[in-house]
Amino acid sequence: QQYCESLEERTTADFDATFKTNVYAMFWITRAALNHLSAGSAIVNTSSVQAFDPDAIVLDYAQTKAAIVAFTKSLAKQLGSEGIRVNAVAPGPYWTPLQVSGGQPQEKIVSMGSGTPMDRPGQPVEIASLYVTLASDESSYCSGQVWCADGGNGTL
């Protein structure tokens, strides 16, 4: 995720790299894993609230996260009869190393998450259990869903 103020500033190489990182890699890893999955297995992808309510400065990133939603829902339909569940998590603003490495305009980092009802960004530990639950048998009848964790904005 690298912010970009204008479509004209985004190069084809940057656009391609974002898709290769977020969409192609997920496709290749999932395809490679399929031979190792059996009934009761779970795939949990990472999308983003940007798939549903994109900021102007993350145009290519938001597109990839929307593609992950479609991939998740479609693959859940393909694999359901095999007993393999496919879901996604769509985080809102979370504090990660990505934020300080160009994922956000640096002047906006201090106010990151202030637009949520919780008035702060989430911490990775606050979303980890969602991934664990979706991967566990506790979610055995949950597939094709996107679970949002966005500090109360109710994106989905």
Predicted regions and their residues:
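Substrate-binding pocket helix/loop in short-chain dehydrogenase/reductase
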Residues: E5-L7, T11-D16, M112
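Residue(s) in the substrate-gating loop at a strand-loop-helix junction
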Residues: S48
